[in-house]
């Protein structure tokens, strides 16, 4: 079994093996899967990190470099007649904590018939496609929780913005 404990800080121009993973699989810190070659792989990554992205590199215990490839999966590709309608669609999806990939004039989310119906009721054009899924990470680290301010275990710093900081 190829055992992987290490995420590399930068992408590498060379690699020895590839892992083709869905978004759900790339979100796990512990995973048993198979490399493109068929070799069994055990991922034991540090918990609390962002999901692996397409092109990320990992180092196996035996020194081999492993490149992550985002496997195509069934998605909903959402477009709208106006930026306002697209913003409304994004708002309603965000209100439901849906993982969302944001592009120039479009949104993508994992296929879900309930969300598809909601988006169509909002006037969006929704097309089912097969593509790699690379959603936004979110503004805060540490995942979803309902902590109280000041509890050290859950007092995560913002990832995208420093609210209230003036320079």
Swiss-Prot record:
<comment type="similarity">
    <text>Belongs to the UreE family.</text>
</comment>
<dbReference type="GO" id="GO:0016151">
    <property type="term" value="F:nickel cation binding"/>
</dbReference>
<dbReference type="InterPro" id="IPR012406">
    <property type="entry name" value="UreE"/>
</dbReference>
<keyword id="KW-0533">Nickel</keyword>
<dbReference type="InterPro" id="IPR004029">
    <property type="entry name" value="UreE_N"/>
</dbReference>
<dbReference type="GO" id="GO:0065003">
    <property type="term" value="P:protein-containing complex assembly"/>
</dbReference>
<dbReference type="GO" id="GO:0005737">
    <property type="term" value="C:cytoplasm"/>
</dbReference>
<dbReference type="GO" id="GO:0051082">
    <property type="term" value="F:unfolded protein binding"/>
</dbReference>
<comment type="function">
    <text>Involved in urease metallocenter assembly. Binds nickel. Probably functions as a nickel donor during metallocenter assembly.</text>
</comment>
<protein>
    <recommendedName>
        <fullName>Urease accessory protein UreE</fullName>
    </recommendedName>
</protein>
<keyword id="KW-0963">Cytoplasm</keyword>
<dbReference type="Pfam" id="PF05194">
    <property type="entry name" value="UreE_C"/>
</dbReference>
<dbReference type="GO" id="GO:0006457">
    <property type="term" value="P:protein folding"/>
</dbReference>
<dbReference type="Pfam" id="PF02814">
    <property type="entry name" value="UreE_N"/>
</dbReference>
<dbReference type="InterPro" id="IPR007864">
    <property type="entry name" value="UreE_C_dom"/>
</dbReference>
<keyword id="KW-0143">Chaperone</keyword>
<dbReference type="GO" id="GO:0019627">
    <property type="term" value="P:urea metabolic process"/>
</dbReference>
<dbReference type="InterPro" id="IPR036118">
    <property type="entry name" value="UreE_N_sf"/>
</dbReference>
<keyword id="KW-0996">Nickel insertion</keyword>
């Amino acid at each position: 079994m190829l055992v992987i404990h290490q995420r590399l800080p930068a992408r590498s121009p060379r690699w020895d093996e590839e892992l083709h993973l869905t978004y759900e699989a790339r979100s796990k810190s512990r995973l048993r899967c198979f490399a493109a070659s068929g070799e069994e792989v055990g991922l034991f990554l540090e918990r609390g990190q962002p999901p692996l992205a397409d092109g990320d590199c990992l180092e196996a215990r035996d020194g081999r470099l492993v490149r992550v490839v985002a496997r195509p999966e069934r998605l909903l590709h959402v477009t709208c007649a106006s930026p306002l309608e697209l913003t409304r669609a994004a708002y309603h999806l965000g209100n439901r904590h849906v993982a969302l990939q944001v592009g120039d004039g479009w949104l993508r989310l994992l296929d879900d018939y309930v969300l598809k119906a909601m988006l169509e009721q909002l006037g969006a054009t929704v097309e089912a496609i097969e593509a790699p899924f690379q959603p936004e990470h979110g503004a805060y680290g540490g995942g979803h929780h309902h902590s109280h301010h000041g509890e050290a275990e859950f007092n995560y710093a913002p990832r995208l913005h420093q609210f209230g900081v003036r320079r």
